[in-house]
């Protein structure tokens, strides 16, 4: 680049693209690696789009800068409009997203200024394109030893003597990540399953998952839902889920400290059988526990340790493929 504006624009673009590359690769390996039907390429779209716009700006700074500015302003308008349509738009949220969205317009303006400088530019500027690719490669090298060779899931129940007691987890069927057509049930739908009219629908709180929840309607075998509550199965607590986390198909030696965002484990847990299905989209399991504000706790397969996720809470009506469940019963 020939001007200070061009050098600043290149540095900012490189930082943004590298961060998106790191986020995309990390989220892909944490959420989507080995999962059936998940388009892994979608995780890399933001970084790829920024990379293409940056490549154009390195070749033709003026035109690339204009496109980046238009993309930044357009994305900002779309994002703010989306928040407004959901009733979530306010000054705090607008300012919180501005560094991500409006920064593109700033970088575009700086590259446009660079484009006004006459004369040839050094070919060394294209080395910047290799940095995001190197970030993806480094992230892959970090994750691949962790995500490959996972123990597959079985279809039957799983019984384990954990630090909090002997637990039995429901087999494949309605007690383990039931799918509702193209979507998955929210915690609120699971917790109010038995409330009239019985079935999956968003029903207002308060919730009593132990009496009205889907798990309470499972028969003793855990394979069928009955017309009346049986009371054999239930959603687990955080302590029970953490104690049952696995690595290499065996218990990972984890314990839970109250309200901590991560577990204390002898080994970093993994998304594998017999507790998890590595080919299914769920990377978190719901618990039966709620906060005083009505949000519900969940536990990631990592136990909140270094490969991603944390023990946290979400609104009860939150439902997506990454938040699953598995019913449990304590044997002793």
Regions found by a protein language model. Give the residues of each.
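Aromatic-anchored segments of alpha-helical transmembrane domains
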Residues: 16-23, 69-83, 136-143
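Juxtamembrane "helix-exit" motif on the non-cytosolic side of transmembrane helices
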Residues: 23-33, 77-89, 145-147
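Alpha-helical transmembrane segments of polytopic membrane proteins
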Residues: 36-51, 79, 91-105
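Cytosolic-side transmembrane helix boundary signature
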Residues: 106-132
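Internal/C-terminal transmembrane anchor helices
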Residues: 122-148
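Short aromatic-cysteine micro-motif
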Residues: 155-234, 238-252
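An exposed tryptophan-centered "aromatic clamp" motif
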Residues: 212-232, 238-303
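Short, structured beta-strand segments at or near domain termini in extracellular proteins/domains
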Residues: 286, 312-332
